[in-house]
């Protein structure tokens, strides 16, 4: 269908205005989707005496709309001017993509349209006459006696929560339409070649149909009738070469700027568009007439359309609705400040984006940062890598290196199984518990607590006020977790094991290296750690210079007993005894504590194999430590057995109930037998008296136990055969312990043992064995 020219359409509109049934357009009767328009105001152009015509293209669909004979539904010419004014107003207010909405309904016709982007403008030979006619029509509107005090503008409906006041805002993804065979008013025959490049691009809005926008008339602003094209399908075709012929400004200046500046690839491009507007504005003469003003708006739209088309062609973006901003005389002057402000803002954002892109291209790392440069991030990565990738195999490959060192123990190969750097221990008081311990996060992301003194609560429950008003058990349960006995013992065990590991590292370093000072500093550090661990165990020492030799209570070794209750605690004591230097005061103090609690430690053998092995290893460690003691330390340990409040389990070796106590006592007596010979040769020593007193008490304790055990066996085996009684006595009597004691007995003690078993033959044999051992002992001593 052929398109009507502008003169025929104008005559048709004038004829429609003579209809006697036509009425003026009342904007107050329309609401959009239930939104009240009472709070809106009617606005217009700033200059009363200047008329800014608004011209635009019209798509074929809109011409089809008039060719179908629906022109009668448009109303009078006054209504048409009213609609044109509203159209210009809506295009000036709406800045974002909107959903389609019905704008008006007049008589037999109802027209609506969606928001569209900036359209191209053309001029022809009839432009001057068209503007004159529109000026006369505006004067006729101004002469009508109608009040517009309560008139309100019609705003397009939108699902957006807010309206943005920016006017010169264009979408970065325009839609490219194929070229049309016709221009807007006037007809194509009179098209000017200077204005024709603007026809290369038309950006439609959301697809959905051709619509018109209507507006209430205003006495202060009159605009020309404006129709804009609307796309009906995905018209994305076009050739990039046709945009190169739009002029030197676009082909030579705009295109390299879009290609080289990465900041405009993201976000708003209103700053760049505004710069083009300013360049066009500076090239125009002063706006003294309507024609010069129209030419300004015309060139602005050409630049916008061409720039948007070039961007879409270069980057093949998806179609999205653009924003249409018709520029009049007052609009260019009104929004110049806002556009410049946004342009400066967008230039800053573009610069930041360009910096981030340059960092990524230079370093090659796939990361972006807002507050840090790539050099700073690289330095942090290097520090993290150095912390998480240590070159010390003792730390990274400990178990494999330990296996290799164990295999090469018998060979002459040099072992490198020692740490490259020792830990630096900070002095800390045992009672100074941190309320908020620091949580250390290593380079691998593992969270390591300094200790288990403050374990995280699995569940925090606030008890009711009446809960603590009950019995004393409820009150006791409200104490802190660290105050629980076993929890405190576990905390001490973990801390002590950490200290022992550091001591082992020092020993390996001294064994495999040769320090300049001969290892004096490391040995001193090792001694300090051992003393600190002995202090943490809170062991009582009656023979110390500041200690009390009498008056010990059961609470003196409470920490030691709680640690020894747990199998891990007994392992700790075993390892500690192995690391102690034999014959030192610390070794004596620990061994005295063990001898004071022989029944607690070796009273029973647990059913668990690992726990039983732990007890056996502890007895062996004590035996090794005792073998290096002097007579004073041996006397102190034997006195600890005598002064204990618990009777030691004096069982025979190999007893199913456990023979740990007998093993350590036999080792002590044997070591004392080796040491006591020297004082007799040297004729006098002060420690001999201490040992003599300690042994006498121990012998009385041993004989009482043997007498009690003998009576118990006889009572259980009354009427039994002699061989049965003899087997029971051998199974229960500590013959090995009695034999080890004969070397330290005097004449009275030996006579007691001789008279001990004269009644039955089995006891006589036991006594004779004791006498024979005593004789052999005396013959050895000489």
Curated annotation (Swiss-Prot):
Tissue expression from the record: Expressed in root vasculature, shoot apical meristem (SAM) and leaves.
Low complexity: bias regions: 108-117
One Gene Ontology term from the biological process aspect of the record: deadenylation-dependent decapping of nuclear-transcribed mRNA
Biased composition, class Polar residues, residue ranges: 208-217, 348-366
Effects seen without this gene: Enhanced root distal stem cell differentiation and increased mitotic activity in root quiescent center.
Listed GO CC annotations: endoplasmic reticulum; Lsm1-7-Pat1 complex; nucleus; P-body
Signal sequence interval, chain numbering: none
UniProt-listed InterPro entries: Pat1-like
UniProt keywords, alphabetically: Cell cycle, Cell division, mRNA processing
Biased segments, Basic residues type: 335-347
Bias-annotated ranges (Basic and acidic residues): 471-481
Region called Disordered, residue ranges: 96-153, 177-217, 332-372, 460-481
Function, as annotated: Activator of mRNA decapping. Involved in mRNA decay via decapping. Involved in the regulation of root stem cell niche identity. Maintains root stem cell niche stability through the interaction with the negative regulator of jasmonate signaling AFPH2/NINJA, and the regulation of cell division.
Subunit structure of this chain's protein: Interacts with AFPH2/NINJA.
Protein's UniProt name: Protein PAT1 homolog 1
Gene: PAT1H1
